Structures are given as structure tokens and as C-alpha cells.
Amino acid sequence: NQIPIAVAAFANEELSPQLVSTIIRDDLNRSGYFRLIEVGTAIAETATVDFENWKGRGATALVVGSVQKKGEGRFDVRYKLFDVQKGEMLSGFSMDTPTPKIRLTAHKIADDIYEKLTGIPGVFSTRIAYVTKAGNQYRLEISDADGEGVQVALTSKEPIISPIWSPDGVKVAYVSMELKKPIVYIQNLMTGQRSTVANFKGNNSSPSWSPDGSKLLVTLSKGAIAQVYAINADGSDAQRLSNSNGIDTEARYSPDGRYIYFVSDRGGNPQIYRMNADGSDVKRITFKGSYNISPRVSPDGNTLVFISRRDGGDHVYAMDLANSNQELKLSDTNRDESPSFAPNGRYVLYATQTGRRGTLGIVSTDAKVKQKLTIQAGEIREPTWGPFMK
């Protein structure tokens, strides 16, 4: 049930290095919630709107705007959103935008349109992180949610694994093999500074943040079998939480911090379990299929996505935690890994394979909208979707 929307070219947008209206259209189109109506000419936000004309063309919403140059390297980007049926303005603002932030401003306008028309916050201005491999070089890269605007956070000859955003979107934790063993680091994306969180004997892996950003869950073997620990973000006070004779790993807090979901092969095959944040009261969560890994909880705590091996492939599944754990297969690809929720809970980013190449896919949590991200790189894996930025 898509919303028919007309996004006019912004007046004078050819003055800016990127066409604002094109970025907005691409965002809305990709979301799956909108059907774009052809417009033709540019329309400024100051123009008088002929609502009957737009009704006749089948639009229920109209976006207009302009771009004005403001001296060296700055633009004033203005926009208005109209409800065509009611003949009234729904939203609008102007943003003083430096040239490198034109894309971001366009994404923010698309976010505003999406939220005003669906009631759900938009995620076009959020960022993603992922690992690329070309030849024998690994790179931790950050980009816009559409795969554009790529920045390199780390380059290494050894594997980089399991990147994950801090709740404030300023840091990324990850595992690097650069010293020939897995070590967990935190890197500040603003300053480039990084610190070691876990470098114990044996395996240090699978970091994830507590909701308040003060702690991380990590998997440590400490020379024995891998178990789940909580550790302060400065690397102090590692406390063991899981206790089993199997491998326990891939631990994630629920958004309220009350529970931890994790993977264990204590019963013979990898399955997803839940325990209280202090490690007590362990319950098995997945019962279908003999291989279920990579649990991720939605921002509202109601949905669990994970990778399940069924029907000859590894697929992204969603489990409705609020409704008797009903399951829905989300992906139609079949070598999927590393699912990650968008911060609005409506989409899941994941890694998959196209041909023999690692690529990224996005699927809506109702499985209706599916898209591939086009990122110019060799192999792409280990995606993680960043939070809303303040």
C-alpha cells in the first residue's frame, strides 16, 4: 500500500555538486513505502501549489524546494512537504549546508518526509559500517545507509571481524587479527584514537555494547572453552556470565539491558539462548532447524532476527518475541550472515553472496521490501547499522 508522492526538482539545485531532489527520490523509492509520480519541471518552495492539478495526477503528497548559494562552499537548502488531499503544508525547513554535507541534508529531508507520512522515523541519514577485502587488504569502512560517502576507518593485512557501533554512534568496537591473534578494540570515529578492550590469553571475540555504552559483552576463552563475559568499555573488570561445557558466543543485550541473547552449542548444535543480564535463568529460544546463530534484538525489544540453516541455505529469519515466538523468513538469498537492525526497527541489513562475491542486502521486517546495496569493493562482509545521531 504505497504512498503516491511527487518530488519536484529543487529550483537552482544544479548549483550544488549533487542534486538534492534525486537523492530524496532515491531514498523514498528504496524504502518501499512510496510510489513516485513524475513531475517534470523544478518547483521552488515559494511557488503557489495547484492542489487540484496534483490530485488529478494521483499524488497524495508533494515535495518542493530550492538550493541557494551562500558564498564560498555553503548552500541554503529549503524544502516544503504538502498534503495534496487536504491542501495544506505538513512540514518544511531550511538548512545552512556546507558543500560536503549536501547528501546528508538531502537524507535528512527524506527522513522528515518518511516520518511525517508513515509515522516512523526515517533512517536515510544514519550510517553503516562493514568490512571489505580486496586482494590481501582488509578495510573497515563507514558509509551512508545507501552505501555512498565511504570513509575508511582502518586498513589491515589481517582480518577485521565483528564491527559494532556504540549506542552514541561515535565509536565502533571490532576484532582485529593484526597481532596474529584476535583482540577486541574500540575506535573513536571522530578522532581515530583506539583502545584495547580485551587481549586475554586465547580467543577474544564477538563484542557488543550495553545499551548505555558503559560495558561490552565479549567472548573469551582465556585458554579454555569460549564463554560470554561482560567487561567495562575501558577493558577493566571482566566478569564471566555464561557457564556451559559448550562454546557460548555472539552475545547481545536486549534494548532494556535486562536480558542477553547468545549462541551456544551446549546441546550439540548451535542454538540461540537467553539469560538474565547477570547470567542467571538460561532459556533456549530457537527450536526449529539444527543451526541458529547471530541473534539481534529490535530496538523495541519485540523482534529477534537471526541466521537459520534450513532448506539448504543460511537465511535471515525474524522471530516475534511478543507473539509466541512465531517465525518469518525474511531473505530470499541463501548464504546470509551478520544481520543488523536499522535503528527504526523496520529494516535489516545483512551480508550475503551474489555469485561468489560478498555483498550487502537490506530487507524489511515484513519481508516485502528487498534491496541490494551497491558498494564498489571486492568482498563485503560483517555489516552493522549505526544508531540515530543526536
Question: For each predicted feature, which ranges?
Answer:
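Blade-level signature of beta-propeller repeat domains, shared across WD40, Kelch, NHL, RCC1
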Residues: 361-390
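A short beta-strand motif characteristic of beta-propeller blades
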Residues: 149-154, 193-198, 237-242, 281-286, ...
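Short beta-strand->alpha-helix linker/helix-N-cap micro-motif
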Residues: 1-54, 63, 67
